[in-house]
Amino acid sequence: MEGIIICIKLGVVFLGTLFTWIFGAWDMPIVTLLVFIFLDYLTGVIKGCKSKELCSNIGLRGITKKGLILVVLLVAVMLDRLLDNGAWMFRTLIAYFYIMNEGISILENCAALGVPIPEFLRQALKQLNNKNNIK
């Protein structure tokens, strides 16, 4: 049993090190983005269960979308490394962009589940949705 626990710990350390090597430091934008990605997927699954629209294809599309967000983030990291100025400029901008998108989706999912959303957040959502629908 102790050997299994050690293997799990080593796996977690390996994944954390790999993630840090790929995406850079675990600063607040990265941590926030990862938390928002998880919360968006979780609230989406809960919403799908409640509306009885949950299926594996929709779940796979959601996981794929989340994975592609990390691909875009990796492109930004590589651009920052190419510039070699010691700052995470592109990575931080991309993280903020997806934090906003994931945050909006979390609020929409919560609203669909009947959670009251403060009016100022509702108005912000409406404005952002209107801007996104204009092509």
From Swiss-Prot:
A Pfam family assignment: Phage_holin_4_1
GO CC terms in record: plasma membrane
Predominant place of localization: membrane
Membrane topology annotation: Multi-pass membrane protein
Keywords carried by this UniProt record: Cell membrane, Membrane, Transmembrane, Transmembrane helix
Xref: InterPro entries: Phage_holin_4_1
Residues spanning the membrane: 4-24, 26-46, 68-88, 93-113
Entry's localization field: Cell membrane
Entry similarity comment: Belongs to the bacteriophage holin family. Cp-1 holin subfamily.
The name this protein goes by in its record: Uncharacterized protein CPE0383
Species of origin: Clostridium perfringens (strain 13 / Type A)
